[in-house]
Swiss-Prot record:
Intervals, Periplasmic compartment: 1-12, 59-68, 114-120, 173-369, 428-430, 480-481
NCBIfam families: PRK10631.1
Gene, per the UniProt record: aaeB
Stated name of the protein: p-hydroxybenzoic acid efflux pump subunit AaeB
Pfam families, alphabetized: FUSC
Organism: Salmonella paratyphi A (strain ATCC 9150 / SARB42)
Cytoplasmic face of the membrane: 34-37, 90-92, 142-151, 391-406, 452-458, 503-655
Protein's job: Forms an efflux pump with AaeA. Could function as a metabolic relief valve, allowing to eliminate certain compounds when they accumulate to high levels in the cell.
Signal sequence coordinates: none
């Protein structure tokens, strides 16, 4: 396929994007909005953003969800701008500097919250800056400008959502159904590999792939939840299926680790059962029936606890999977599964990374302000806006440098493209709304094709071109103003890129260490006799942290194995029959406090000291377990955990 070819699957979204732009343009001029450009720009960004992220037409609900986030972010930004202006209108320079700090603060928050919701915070930061900069000449018009901006953005979002509904968006439901079947087959094949106890690298690749697929399934669940209210029951089941899938991975990997020291625990009966190859979910269903009969026949006590737990989790997975596919009423048995343990939310391990993002964004905006004041450039406000937009959006993504490069390419491409529209097309079509709409529809259609291919610069070119062409009411054609706007965008992107290059993000190793210590803390916190604490479901949070670790350190198998071992220790200790008495309960609290000190330690020396204290306390704890005659189900996991912490002490304490 050629570089400029158009694939059939890309046409529908390109038409959808063109329709959203035309609708926003028509409504903006019909209702005599002062700057219909904002409505058109909003419609284009809201529609094209999810397509660029997905690399194709986004699934149903994605555009609506992004639109809602944009509305929330705009209102937060407008309120913040009003507060800043009212408080500091007599000190314009201080007002702009405080607004720069606000943009950095919003970027800091967006780096800590869920990636799906971070868009609203990033948007609220640069919305406030846009308002503060725009009203410099007429500060008394601030409330009117904020209201107009909110109205234009709501119109643009409404047009994007309407266009999405008109062109029958794709439903993700069929993809979810297929993935549920495929995932269960892959889970069974992972257990086969672990029972065989073959090549460790093959097992690592298999469970790593399953962790990624389970995380992807959770993302599909979010999309399905956004799609329609009729999937509420399926959404509840998919939440439980996420935990069950992670449980299956954990039990399989623990089965592999157990065979390193006690291979005799896996009897020949189960080895023969798992030798049967499976290709479909029906094959897995038949095998599970056979296993349940064998477990009933041999008895629970004669069945390895990991296999017993795995078969139970796989059976529950099958039951909920059928419910998701049929979307029928939740049965009493399913309700019992769904009313399981409360899920504990993950605590961010990227606080240092978020602070780096804060300084990058704040310094970029302050540098832009100083450049504007020093040069007295008439388009300094446009340059400031681009700095805020680029840094706010780039900081939330894994590779901010590439986002900046994308914007630089986009603004460079927007210069000749905008020139064509400014000098030739718009002056010759402004007398006819039909021709004006058609000209912008053509722009939206062809850039919509490139956006779906994730062409470098396509997203930036779409936003930058719409931003510099004349779509105001009434239209005025001042070439110097156009050139200033176009150059301001380019300079703003380049200044943001320079700051990102100069302010290095060296938080990767620190984030990795914090993640590993959080795994240790989770394993230690599982040693408790508190009934409420034992019922907490930390598995999704732990695997979310493992997924982040895999993304931060691709190919670092020792880190992945250590993290997985800590997750297995957490699950085993959580279910272990720890003796209930006051002496152990007090010591459990002491262990948790020490583990928390390890995570929060500000220096390597403190961290080593607290980690050494934790190891000493674990040795004392093992002695207490011996005194209180704890069963092997408790003493063996604690001994394995202590051994792992001794072995990887340097990796867990050094920066």
């Amino acid at each position: 396929m050629g570089i400029f070819s158009i694939a059939n699957q890309h046409i529908r979204f390109a038409v959808k994007l063109a329709c959203a732009i035309v609708l926003a343009l028509f409504i903006g001029f019909h209702f005599q909005l002062e700057t219909p450009r904002w409505a058109v720009l909003t419609a284009a960004i809201v529609a094209a953003g999810p397509a660029f992220a997905a690399g194709g037409e986004p699934y149903s609900g994605a555009i609506r969800y992004r639109g809602m986030l944009r509305i929330i972010g705009t209102f937060i930004g407008c309120i913040a701008a009003l507060i800043i202006i009212i408080s500091m209108i007599r000190a314009p320079l201080l007002m702009i500097l405080v607004c720069c700090v606000w943009v950095g603060f919003c970027t800091w928050i967006s780096s800590l919250v869920r990636i799906e919701n971070s868009y609203a915070w990033g948007l609220s930061g640069y919305t406030a800056l846009i308002i503060v900069i725009t009203i410099q000449t007429e500060p008394l018009l601030t409330p009117q400008f904020a209201l107009e901006r909110c109205s234009e953005i709501v119109i643009g979002i409404g047009c994007a959502i309407l266009a999405d509904l008109l062109f029958s968006p794709r439903s993700i439901k069929q993809e979810v159904d297929r993935e549920l079947d495929s995932l269960l087959v892959a889970q069974y094949q992972l257990m086969q590999l672990c029972i065989k106890h073959g090549d460790s690298e093959e097992v690592d690749n298999a469970w790593g792939d399953l962790v990624r697929r389970t995380a992807a399934l959770e993302g599909m669940r979010s999309n399905l939840n956004m799609e329609s209210s009729r999937w509420v029951r399926a959404n509840r089941r998919l939440k439980a299926l996420n935990t069950l899938s992670l449980t299956l991975i954990t039990q399989s990997c623990e089965t592999y680790l157990i065979q390193n020291t006690r291979p005799e625990l896996i009897t020949d009966t189960f080895r023969e059962l798992f030798e049967t190859p499976v290709e479909t979910v029906q094959d897995v269903h038949r095998q599970l029936k056979r296993m349940r009969r064998v477990i009933v026949w041999t008895g629970e006590r004669e069945t390895p606890v990991t296999l017993y737990s795995w078969v139970g989790a796989a059976t529950r997975y099958l039951l909920l999977k059928r419910g998701v596919i049929s979307n029928t009423k939740i049965s009493a048995t399913e309700e019992e599964i769904l009313q399981g343990e409360p899920v504990v939310k993950v605590e961010s391990a990227e606080r240092h990374h978020a602070m780096v993002n804060f300084w990058r964004t704040t310094l970029s905006c302050i540098l832009g302000t100083l450049f504007w004041l020093w040069t007295g450039w008439t388009s300094g406000n446009g340059e400031m806006v681009m700095i805020a937009v680029v840094t706010s959006l780039a900081m939330r993504l894994p590779n901010p440098r590439m986002v900046c490069i994308d914007f630089i390419y986009g603004t460079l491409a927007a210069l000749p493209l905008g020139l064509l529209y400014f000098l030739v097309i718009i002056p010759n079509t402004q007398q006819s709304m039909l021709l004006l709409c058609l000209s912008l529809a053509v722009l939206g259609f062809f850039i919509g094709i490139e956006v779906q291919k994730r062409r470098l610069g396509s997203m930036g070119a779409l936003a930058s071109t719409i931003n510099i062409i004349v779509l105001d009411n009434p239209m005025t054609f001042h070439f110097s103003q156009f050139l200033d706007s176009a150059l301001g965008q380019i300079v703003g992107c380049m200044l943001a890129f320079i700051v990102i290059l100069l302010v290095r993000d060296k938080s990767k190793d620190r984030t990795g260490r914090v993640l590993l210590n959080q795994f240790v803390s989770a394993a230690v916190s599982a040693m408790t006799t508190n009934v409420v604490r034992r019922k907490e479901n930390r598995l999704p949070a732990l695997y979310q942290q493992l997924f982040l670790l895999m993304n931060k350190f691709p190919g670092d198998l020792p880190k992945f194995r250590l993290a997985l071992t800590m997750i297995i220790a957490h699950q085993r200790l959580r279910d272990a029959p720890i003796p209930v008495n006051e002496d152990l309960s007090v010591f459990h609290r002491q262990l948790r406090r020490t583990a928390d000190h390890v995570i929060s330690a500000g220096s390597d020396d403190k961290r080593r000291r607290y980690f050494g204290q934790l190891l000493d306390e674990l040795d004392i704890y093992q002695e207490k377990l011996r005194i209180w005659e704890a069963p092997p189900q408790v003493t063996e996991p604690v001994k394995r955990l202590t051994g792992m912490l001794h072995k990887y002490q340097n990796a867990l304490t050094d920066s």
